[in-house]
């Protein structure tokens, strides 16, 4: 009999008990000493809610839009690689859950299901593609063309990964894909991270990135990508106001404030703490989103109050997959949705339009752990 899980932490604890250690460690871990990993979550507690009273919250409307597309709630699924390690259906289960709830899914380029397979599994789902810039630009171009062909609505280009962060658990575990899996969007065994290939004795993924991803990428490559497609493009991994302004200058359509789940450079700020700087920098010219550390409905409310249009969740989704596949993902999203609805109501917000910065203040006594 399956246990009763009622919050995101419950799902993680269950996943830890059922997933192979190397797979759980891959999903859970951050870079180096994991200071930023802890701070991504802890930082939300430094921001306190100041609710409004007597605002008639008998009915609440959670719906909003992301890059012009309607979603049932400002909680979307972020790019999480290789989801079939958590459940046999992987990304297909995730997109079906998103379709059921009316929210969006960002598909990782490193998915264990292809762009086409995910589109076929969730034909009515709002889908976006996360993109890396490969040394072979034709590989990148092909991914973009596949996304366009299959009805994906935007490209989220990752800008924080010229090399892979130093993830100690992956080094200790000599992380590789299980033998039956590969990255399905690539044809060659090297690009598909096939277990048949030799990726060394440390983190296989770090070796993969060193072989395949271009560390020389610059704003010139963003210009190239902007010319390549008419789809909206969002810069994923921005943590500075000047970089955000540069992204706007280069014609990008959004900023995803992200530290890659604290998996790249340890010691960077929690995303919720830098969100106000990014929002101020773009001056309303593009939409701003956030990922990193979102585990509760109050986290969503705080992010929106500080200017995010929506948040993206990653690890909670794979914990849901590990529990019960599509139903597990749906349950995780339903929990976050209901927690967010309750937080809105208890803060006097009938809809997301009335959520603003007057709802939150940073605790003056709080000190970052970094």
Swiss-Prot record:
**Ligand binding (glyoxylate):** 26, 132, 167, 260, 263
Q: Which residues carry this modification: Phosphoserine?
A: 194, 230
Found, by tissue, as follows: Highly expressed in liver.
Which one of the record's GO molecular function terms can you name?
A: FMN binding
The entry's FMN-binding residues are 79-81, 108, 130, 158, 236, 258, 291-295, 314-315
Q: Name one GO biological process term.
A: glycolate catabolic process
Which segments does the entry list as coiled coil? none
Pathway per its UniProt entry is: Amino-acid biosynthesis; glycine biosynthesis
Q: Which reaction does it catalyse?
A: a (2S)-2-hydroxycarboxylate + O2 = a 2-oxocarboxylate + H2O2; glycolate + O2 = glyoxylate + H2O2; glyoxylate + O2 + H2O = oxalate + H2O2 + H(+); 2-hydroxyhexadecanoate + O2 = 2-oxohexadecanoate + H2O2
Cite the PROSITE patterns for this sequence. FMN_HYDROXY_ACID_DH_1 (PS00557), FMN_HYDROXY_ACID_DH_2 (PS51349)
Task: List locations, semicolon-separated.
Answer: Peroxisome matrix
Among CDD domains, the record links this protein to: alpha_hydroxyacid_oxid_FMN (cd02809)
Its main subcellular localisation, reduced to a broad class, is: other
What's the Enzyme Commission number for this chain?
A: 1.1.3.15, 1.2.3.5
Top-level taxon: Eukaryota
| Needed cofactors | FMN
Alphabetically ordered keywords of this record: Amino-acid biosynthesis, Flavoprotein, FMN, Oxidoreductase, Peroxisome, Phosphoprotein
Residue ranges of every copy of the FMN hydroxy acid dehydrogenase domain listed in the record: 1-365
What does the record note on quaternary structure?
Answer: Homotetramer.
**Function (record text):** Broad substrate specificity (S)-2-hydroxy-acid oxidase that preferentially oxidizes glycolate. The glyoxylate produced by the oxidation of glycolate can then be utilized by alanine-glyoxylate aminotransferase for the peroxisomal synthesis of glycine; this pathway appears to be an important step for the detoxification of glyoxylate which, if allowed to accumulate, may be metabolized to oxalate with formation of kidney stones.
Q: What is this protein called?
A: 2-Hydroxyacid oxidase 1
UniProt source species: Homo sapiens
């Amino acid at each position: 009999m399956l246990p009763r899980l009622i919050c995101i932490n419950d799902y993680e604890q269950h996943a830890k008990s059922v997933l192979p250690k190397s797979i759980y460690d891959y999903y859970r871990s951050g870079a180096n000493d994991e200071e930023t990993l802890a701070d991504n979550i802890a930082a939300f507690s430094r921001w306190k809610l100041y609710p409004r009273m007597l605002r008639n919250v008998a009915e609440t409307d959670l719906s909003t839009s992301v890059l012009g597309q309607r979603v049932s709630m400002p909680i979307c699924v972020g790019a999480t690689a290789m989801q079939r390690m958590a459940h046999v259906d992987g990304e297909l289960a995730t997109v079906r859950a998103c379709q059921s709830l009316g929210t969006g899914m960002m598909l990782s380029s490193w998915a264990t299901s292809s762009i086409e397979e995910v589109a076929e599994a969730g034909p009515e789902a709002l889908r976006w593609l996360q993109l890396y810039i490969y040394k072979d630009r034709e590989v990148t171009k092909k991914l973009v063309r596949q996304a366009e062909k299959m009805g994906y609505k935007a490209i989220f280009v990752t800008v924080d990964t010229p090399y892979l962060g130093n993830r100690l658990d992956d080094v200790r575990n000599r992380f590789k894909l299980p033998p039956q899996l590969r990255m399905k969007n690539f044809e060659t065994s090297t690009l598909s991270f096939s277990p048949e290939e030799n990726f060394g004795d440390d983190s296989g993924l770090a070796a993969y990135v060193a072989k395949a991803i271009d560390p020389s990428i610059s704003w010139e490559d963003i210009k190239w990508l902007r010319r390549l497609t008419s789809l909206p493009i969002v810069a994923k991994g921005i943590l500075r106001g000047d970089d955000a302004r540069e992204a706007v200058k280069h014609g990008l359509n959004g900023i995803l404030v992200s530290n890659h789940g604290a998996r790249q450079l340890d010691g960077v700020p929690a995303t919720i703490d830098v969100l106000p700087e990014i929002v101020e920098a773009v001056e309303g010219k593009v939409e701003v989103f956030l990922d990193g550390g979102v585990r509760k409905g109050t986290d969503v409310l705080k992010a929106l109050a500080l200017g995010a249009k929506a948040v993206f969740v990653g690890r909670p989704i794979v914990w849901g997959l590990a529990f019960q596949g599509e139903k597990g993902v749906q349950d995780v999203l339903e929990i976050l949705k209901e927690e967010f609805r309750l937080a809105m109501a208890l803060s006097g917000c009938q809809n997301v339009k009335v959520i603003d910065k007057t709802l939150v203040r940073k605790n003056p006594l709080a000190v970052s752990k970094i």
